[in-house]
Amino acid sequence: MTTVPPHSVQVHTTTHRYEAGVVPPARFEAPRYEAGIKAPSSIYHSERGPTTSQVLAVVAGLPVGGILLLLAGLTLAGTLTGLVVATPLFIIFSPVLIPATVAIGLAVAGFLTSGVFGLTALSSFSWILNYIRETQPASENLAAAAKHHLAEAAEYVGQKTKEVGQKTKEVGQDIQSKAQDTREAAARDARDAREAAARDARDAKVEARDVKRTTVTATTATA
């Protein structure tokens, strides 16, 4: 009776190849997320509150958009009011073409300005929404960078304020010196005028005395 040798298994560490009809064990694979399902980390980030960059974007964009919308509305209202007021004038003063042309140009400029302000405001709101939707979580030093920029802006404003104050002081000194020069010139002119008047008075007295003397002499000679 012959014995059948057992099946032998050869394992190669480099290729992981199995021979002699032995079925390799099943490998464990990490579960995949498909069909647009995000990983738990992204879910965690989506459940977090608004980041500093989003807050700064909203704070910076909302006032700009609101102001531009307000300017657009005011410009449109002013343009319409101007047209309502100017239309009867166009009908009455139709031969005057230059004012009509200027008014039409101003009206067109008003409409264009209103449209530009409105489009800019809408673009600002759209940018805010896109930025909030697509922005990534802010880094740790974002607050420090914002504080640094605010400090630089405050320093710049303080320096400009100091320069404006210095220029205002210099202009005030110049105005004061010019006023003093003007007062001195006026006083000098008044003094010269008084001296000229006194001199004219003396000359008039001398001339009157000479005339009187001449008259007396002529009367004496006639007598």
UniProtKB/Swiss-Prot annotation:
It is found in: Lipid droplet; Membrane. One of its GO terms (biological process) is seed oilbody biogenesis. Residues 158-171 are annotated as: 2 X 7 AA tandem repeats. Its main location: other. GO terms for cellular component: membrane; monolayer-surrounded lipid storage body. The keyword Transmembrane helix applies. Residues 1-57 are annotated as: Polar. Pfam families: Oleosin. The chain crosses the membrane at residues 55-75, 89-109, 110-130. Residues 214-223 have a biased composition (Low complexity). Residues 167-223 are annotated as: Disordered. Residues 183-204 are annotated as: 2 X 11 AA tandem repeats. Residues 58-129 are annotated as: Hydrophobic. Sequence repeats lie at residues 158-164, 165-171, 183-193, 194-204. InterPro entries: Oleosin. Keywords: Lipid droplet, Membrane, Repeat, Transmembrane, Transmembrane helix. Residues 180-213 have a biased composition (Basic and acidic residues). It is a multi-pass membrane protein. Belongs to the oleosin family. This is P24 oleosin isoform B. It comes from Glycine max (Soybean).
